[in-house]
Amino acid sequence: GPVTEDVGLKKVLANLKSEWRVLVDMSYFQGFTHEEISKILNIPLGTVKTRIRSALSQLRTMIQP
């Protein structure tokens, strides 16, 4: 069920670079917008978007069998 998938996702997240992991966690698990993340972490909005996009594409390759 969903719980197992969530645990699996957390395991996969653990393999991401730490700066990507923080952004994915804030964006998807804590519900912050990209703009909020940019302000909180004091990094440019473009950087937030680029890192999240990179992280998600890497996650996809890890998740695919």
Regions found by a protein language model. Give the residues of each.
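DNA-recognition helix of helix-turn-helix
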Residues: L41-P65
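Acidic, proline/glycine-rich intrinsically disordered inter-domain spacer in sigma factors
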Residues: G1-A14
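Short, locally clustered residues in the helix-turn-helix/winged-helix DNA-binding domain
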Residues: L13-A14, Y28, R60
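A short pre-motif secondary-structure segment
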Residues: L23-S27
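The N-cap/first-turn positions of alpha helices
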Residues: E19-W20
